[in-house]
């Protein structure tokens, strides 16, 4: 009886390790290409922020951590007609709560959207497109289990966004929520996630 219990424990431990995916692969999109795209998007976001300040460049040390209102937010509240897509109080509140993890107000959201755009994963309105995201993430993967995981993750995350109405009208927040959702799935399923984390958007 003890041998049977030992055998069952060994088998269950063996099957647990089988289900932990190695999500980092030499197949698929190259890490260098992904990093280059994100860097370009971050650079573009910085330029857009500088233009929004009337060409004055960054004030102070260039880092805004979301502690209270900054100059840009005060300016947006005084000049509500000049929103540029980011001026309403609700969005500002989202940025402030999320701003502790980012060096710019809306940067993480719009960097994510820029990334999807640059990788041709958006629809005609600039919103992340389910089929394009799924195709681009899986087209070069030979490992069937990993390909299925990515496909399922994309499907589940788009369902989540649709069911909660998140980002339906704002492409930056939709992209950011999609990245967050896919990151959570990867964190839960990929054994090599802790080693590398989500280097692109966190």
Swiss-Prot record:
Expressed in non-neuronal cells in hygrosensitive sensilla in the second chamber of the sacculus of the antenna third segment (at protein level). Its main location: secreted. Residues 43-53 have a biased composition (Basic and acidic residues). One of its GO terms (biological process) is sensory perception of chemical stimulus. Residues 43-105 are annotated as: Disordered. GO terms for molecular function: odorant binding. Pfam families: PBP_GOBP. GO terms for cellular component: extracellular region. Keywords: Behavior, Secreted, Signal, Sulfation. It is found in: Secreted. Coiled coil: none annotated. Residues 1-20 form the signal peptide. Disruption phenotype: Viable with no morphological, mobility or chemosensory response defects. Results in defective hygrotaxis behavior which might be related to increased desiccation resistance and overall longer lifespan. Residues 54-65 have a biased composition (Gly residues). Belongs to the PBP/GOBP family. Odorant-binding protein required for hygrotaxis behavior in humidity-detecting sensilla. This is Odorant-binding protein 59a.
